[in-house]
Design a protein with these regions (language model features):
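Charged, low-complexity intrinsically disordered regions
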Residues: 2-186
């Protein structure tokens, strides 16, 4: 298992190249300020990857203040299946909406469609998934932090967001494992 409540904060600058890649692939909106927290790296559910909480802020000139444009979960997985090329997977699992139709039809097997359907049922269209040269990049815009910890004198009530975040991470690992399902490596 892993401890989401006391997850490690990523070392300063360690995730910057990865965050830039998420922006280039179109998984998250571009912004001037990034804050990453609760970094987790390791194998889970049959896939090796990492997940972290990310907040993206963009400067809004007319209001003279930064505006939050993304606050959610980002994950990157190294797939065992040697997939070459790039494809964007839509949350509805429709292969005709993928950016590379041939690759999308090949990858959208029933287990992958089921994993995408679970994510869509929970988060609607706030999911962005891109496969690029054997790596799966997924972002879910939750528009909230992973943890809403109570204040100093507040009672710890309604802590349902902690298991909900754990479920989100588990569903992302399930998606990566589904993409690798049936792959023997030979």
């Amino acid at each position: 298992g892993y401890d989401l409540i006391y997850g490690r904060n990523p070392p300063r600058g360690r995730l910057k190249p990865l965050i830039t890649l998420f922006e280039i692939l179109g998984c998250i909106p571009r912004g001037q300020y990034h804050v990453a927290r609760h970094w987790f790296v390791g194998p889970l559910g049959g896939a090796d990857g990492q997940a972290f909480e990310l907040t993206v802020w963009r400067w809004r000139e007319e209001e003279l203040r930064p505006v939050r444009v993304f606050h959610g979960l980002c994950a990157r997985f190294a797939l065992a299946r040697p997939i070459k090329g790039s494809v964007r997977l839509r949350a509805d699992g429709n292969p005709d909406q993928g950016s590379d139709l041939t690759l999308a039809h090949r990858l959208l097997t029933p287990p992958v469609r089921a994993a995408l359907a679970r994510l869509r049922a929970r988060h609607g269209d706030r999911i962005s998934a891109v496969i690029r040269d054997g790596l799966l990049f997924v972002a879910i815009d939750l528009q909230r932090p992973w943890y809403r910890l109570p204040g100093l004198f507040a009672e710890e009530v309604n802590m349902t967001h902690i298991p909900a975040t754990a479920d989100d991470i588990e569903m992302l690992w399930d998606l990566a494992a589904a993409l690798d399902a049936g792959w023997s490596g030979s």
